Structure formats: C-alpha cells, structure tokens
Amino acid sequence: MQQKMLRILEFDKVKEQLAEHASSALGLEKIAALVPSSDLDEVAVWLEETDEAAAVLRLRGYVPLDGVVDIRSHLKRAAIGGVLSPIELLEVAATAAASRQMKQLIMSLHDEHGGLARLADYADELAEVPALEEDIRRSIDDHGEVLDTASDRLRSLRGQIRAAEARIREKLESIIRSPSAQKRLSDAIITIRNDRYVIPVKQEYRSAYGGIVHDQSASGATLFIEPQVVVELNNALREARAKEKQEIERILRELSAKVAEHDEPLKRAVEALAHFDFLFAKAKYARRLQAAKPAVNNRGYLRFLQARHPLIDQDKAVPNDIVLGGDYTTIVITGPNTGGKTVTLKTVGLLTIMAQAGLFIPAADGSEAAVFRSVFADIGDEQSIEQSLSTFSSHMVNIVDILRHVDEESLVLFDELGAGTDPQEGAALAIAILDEVHGRGARTVATTHYPELKAYGYNRPGVVNASVEFDTETLRPTYKLLIGIPGRSNAFDISRRLGLDERIIERAKVQVSAESHSVENMIASLERSKKQAEEDEARAHSAREEAERLRAEWEQKLEELEDKKAEQLAEAAQKATDIIRAAEREAERIINELRRLQKEKQAEVKEHELIAAKQRLAAAVPVVEKRKKTKKATARHAFQSGDEVKVTSLNQKGYLLEKVSEDEWQVQLGILKMKIHERDLEYIGSAPAKEVTPIATVKGKDAHVSLELDLRGERYEDALVRLEKYIDDAVLAGYPRVSIIHGKGTGALRQGVQQFLKQHRAVKSFRFGAANEGGTGVTVVELK
C-alpha cells in the first residue's frame, strides 16, 4: 500500500495516537514500522492478537511492561566480553523481571480462562532468569551504586575507607579548631582537592602546616594545603579507593559474564516483549476509542455500523452506518461544500486501513471490513480535512495515477471529483471517471457538488446516491449520512435565514430551471420520507426491544418458578427420607431390645412387654402414599388371612393373620405382629397355613426356649452339641422358624452349622438372614 495514500488518509496521525500507549522504545519501534496488510489471513491473525490483548486488559487492567528497556546492545557487548555499567545491568534486571512477570501473567490467565492461545505462544519466548535478577539486585541499588553486599572484599575495603576518612577528618578538625586557626586559615572548613583532604590556608602562613599545596584561589590569597600530618593517611585512603575501584570492576565483569550466559533467551525475550508492548498499545488505543473488533473478508464488502472518525473528539463525532460492496459498489455523495462529505470519505478509508493494520475500529459490534489489495485516495492536495481543496491539475495527476493501478481488489476514494474547472466539463469528466472505476469492479466512494451527478445513482446499477444532512436552522451540517438521498442545494434557505430580502430570493428562484426546481423538491420529499421511515424504524426497534425485555423477564420468572418447584420437591423428598430413616432407627432399636430380652438367661418376654413393643414399632412406621398404579392393584385384590404380603413402608414380607378393622390387618413380620393399613400392603400370594401360625409359647419359666441360639465364641464340637439340643427343643416348642447366630468370622462354624442342618430330619429349609436380621452372620431355619 502506497505511503502517499496512508499519509493522505492521515494514518500517520493514528499511529501517533497509538504510540501514546506504548510503554517502551521497543513498542514505539514496532508502531513506527506498522503498515496495513493486504493478506486476509495475516489481518485476521493481527486482529485476533489485539482481541486477546484486550481480553487481558479486561481481566487484569494492567500489564507489567513499565520496566522494559531495549537491552539488545547490552547483550551484544556482554556476549563479546564487555563490562556493563551498573545502570545497564539494572536495565537488564528490570527487563528480565518484566519478561518473567509477563510470562506468569499470560500463562495463568490462559490456564484459568483460556482463549489466549496466540499470546501464550509469544509468552513461550519469554525468559525466566530469577537468579540473574537476584544477583544484580543484590549488588546494585536503584540509583546505580554498587552495594557493600556485592562482595565480602568490597565490604571490607569500604570499611577501611570510612575508617581512614574518619581519622583524616579528626586530625584536620583538630587543626581548624586550634586557637591559631582563625589567624592562619581563610575559612574553618575541610575540603577536597585532587581526591585528597585539604584546608584553606592564607598565603602568608604557607609554611605553618608543612605538607603539599594542591590548589590556590583565583586571587592567590588562599592555598589549599594537605598538612603533613595527614599525608600518609591520605595516601592510605587513596590506595584503599583504588582497590575499591578494582573490586567494583571485578564485580561488574562477573555480573556481565552472567548476563552473557543468558544472551540468547534474553534476546528472544526482548523481541517478545516488544511485540507484547505493541499489542497492548493497540488494545489500550481500542479502549480509548471505544473501538470494536471487525470481522474481515476478501469479498470487497464493508459494513461499518455507527462508524466514527478516529481523529475527531469521540464525544463530538457523529456516528454513521456505512455499507458498501453488497447491493451497490459505488456511493456518490452529493451536496454543497459543507465539510461533512470529506469527513465521511476519510472515515471509510481510515477505518479500512486501520482494520488491515490489525487495529480495532471506532464502530459498533457487528461491523465488517474488507481487506483490499490497494486503497487509493484523491482527497485535496494531501491536506487535512480542515483545509481547502487542491487545484484541478493536482486532482487530475492523482486520478491518472489511480486509473493506472485500480482493479476489483481496490478501494477508491474521490473527494470533489471533477472540481476546479468548468462545471459542465467537470461533471462530464466525473461521470466518465466513475464509470471507468465502477466498470473495473472497484469499491468507490466519491463526493461532488455537481447537480448533474444527482441522477447518476438512479441510472447505474450498483451505484447509490447519498448526502450529508444539513440543518437549515443552525446553518450547519449534522454530519449524518443519508444513503439513497442525493444532496440538495440549501442556498435559498440559508440566505433566508441570514436575512436576505424575500423579493430577491423569489427573483433568484425564477432564474432556476423548472427541472432543477422539481429535482430539489423531489429530494426534499425523499429526505422527509427517509426521516419518517427512520423514525418508524426506531419506534419498531424500541417496541421489539421492549418485547424482548418482557420475554426475557417472563422466561426468568418461569425459570425461578421451576427452580422453586424443584427445590420444594427436593425438600419434601428429604423430609420423607428423614421420616423413614427415623422410623427405621426406631424399629431397629425396638427389635434389638426384644432380642436382648430373649437372650437374657432364664428371662421371659412378658405378654404386656411384647404388646408395648409392637405398638411402639407400629407407631414408628410412617404412612406412605403409594403410586396410583399400586393403589389400584391393591384395591383390586381382596385380602384374606394367610396371604403373603409386602409391607411397602418397611420393605418387609409377612403374612396376614386377621383383619382387625375395616382397613387394617394384623400382620406377622418375623417374630412381630403389627397392625398395618391396607394401603401399605402389596399382595404377593397365598401361603401355607403354618407359615402364619402364631409363635408357640411353652409356659413356665424353666420351659422357655429362645427364638435365637447364639453360638458365637463356642468351640466347634460344643457348638454342634448345643445346636442339636436347641433344634429338638424348638421342635417340641412348636416354633415354625428360629435363628442361629454363628457370626461371620472365618466361616468354619457357619459351614458346620449349615452342614448339620442339611442332615437334620426336622429342618425344612434354611437361609442366611436378611440385612436387618444379621446378614451372613445368622442362619434362619424353617422347621417342619
């Protein structure tokens, strides 16, 4: 892209504003070299990088670039064995710190939020050399002075220097405080000449102190003498300072050598930091302009929504929608020379090359920019938009050059096409030039004040007229672009507003042809119609937004209701679960209590105790509403004594003993009898009568047989003897079912018990206990 065109469109001023946001000379160097690209893929990458940098600013608000310095020359000197100064070493440390901090920032944000793939690639090039940073910071202070802590020898030498200086001052102060000092000295001070401590002695007392004369005053009346008593001390001080200088040189050489060790990674880091500074300058500039990332294409289609000229105060700039390359490829902006047309023209060109340079554009989201191979502009005599137009010859030189190169991948901008010559000939030339450029497929925006071009957009496919709105009340352009409406002359309205006599205005109107007058009236009518259409569209847009707002509001309310419903259902389910769990715990406690009573030696469970336990167990069971399907199935079956049923609330099987009320049954559940409501029962099938035989009871304290036999801890042989006797006693007692507790353990006793039961003639069947009966630690035996 020609530098001349960039200068005409004032891209250099955009770069000047962009440079205000750079943090280092490295960033400024990149900005100075910035030129638009005509490669679509490259432009897309540049915009993506700017977008990622803008995302970092949104997430963090800052980037660690303040300490970045161009240290490439430092690295080069260090690499060939040169010694860096303390300030240069500090700049290396500061740049290394910025590299480390930037890498940590980008990588942490990329890991946390994602979406920073391109910046993460650049961050991979950033060096992390904390040891080098620490060595430099430990040796040199912020003012570039080598610290005592740089080495033990330097600390020792500086201690010697301070001690020598103190002794010298002590001796010289004793001289200037002596009674004779007032007479012999020009002033009672200690000063330094040639790096040696001296005192000002009057000329006539030159020999009073002996020593060496190092200087004299301009008049010669005062001599600066190093008294003999401090000559040796000054010599020792000078020697110590020479050694200090040598040690400092050694330290700087050592640090420079360490810098040289990291030469390559630091070089790559400098290049990466330069690019980061460049990208974040673009992101900061976008924030300043309230700019947006445009989509890009190579179809020659641009759509700038609410576009503003970037060099005009953004609070005062009038936004315009500008579309080109769709239904029409040429826009002809007509109307009087008010200045608004040129601003619009430059806005199109400048926003295009900004996008092609990877910059966000001052336009609304949803904007789209075309990537052109060439952008041509004939706008004045390379002057700013505030200055006057150039001559016809200057225009024509530019136009001839443009016509040599223009093609379908070009954007062409003509300002006041055909101006500066005879109006009739100028208008004819303008039409011919537009036809040529339009015919080559270029995208064109042209401004003109010739009325002959007002009809141009109506007679050519792919061409549209436009104008810049003019406020006849304020006599100023509003800078609002009106697409589809040609500009009209406002000379009569302006003259009337300025006080010109109405008779003169009417006389002037007579001189205007009827055709021109008709065209002006038509344009005025178009303006009114367009304004009305825009107002209608604005009202429709407002109504649509209100409808969207209401829809979103109701969707939110519906979502809140659904959430509340789900929350209430979850709460109810939790309450039900809590009730059932409480009932299970109470039932378990009651059963355990019964088992404890039965296991006690010689203990009998009295009838009233058993009844009380049954009642507590029944009270602990919640009444649970079953599903409709279950209720219907239950209603269809007529329960009878002896039916095998399932108590759904307890998930236990049992047998119906007798109906105790209209809708309640007494149910045998293991060793317990309970009253259960019919709605809590599920029919399983009929059962043998003896399955529901009441638990037999042998009267008398000595004749009581427990329903359980606990063999845990017994020796194998003793356990089998007890088991055989227990089965016989249970059969005699008439028990239909008993439980043998053998524990889980190694399984030896369990296997022995079950092997014995297989062979016993009185055993009908046996099984492991259910989860609430003791599991595999218990065998439940059905007796014949």
Swiss-Prot record:
InterPro entries from the UniProt entry: DNA_mismatch_repair_MutS_C, DNA_mismatch_repair_MutS_core, DNA_mismatch_repair_MutS_sf, MSSS, MutS, MutS2, P-loop_NTPase, Smr_dom
GO annotation terms (biological process): mismatch repair; negative regulation of DNA recombination; rescue of stalled ribosome
Domain Smr: start-end pairs: 709-784
GO MF terms, alphabetically ordered: ATP binding; ATP hydrolysis activity; ATP-dependent DNA damage sensor activity; endonuclease activity; mismatched DNA binding; ribosomal large subunit binding; rRNA binding
CDD domains: ABC_MutS2, ATP-synt_Fo_b
Pfam families documented for this protein: MSSS, MutS_V, Smr
UniProt EC number: 3.1.-.-, 3.6.4.-
Record keywords, A-Z: ATP-binding, DNA-binding, Endonuclease, Hydrolase, Nuclease, Nucleotide-binding, RNA-binding, rRNA-binding
HAMAP family: MutS2
Family: Belongs to the DNA mismatch repair MutS family. MutS2 subfamily.
Name the UniProt record assigns to this protein: Endonuclease MutS2
Organism per entry: Geobacillus thermodenitrificans (strain NG80-2)
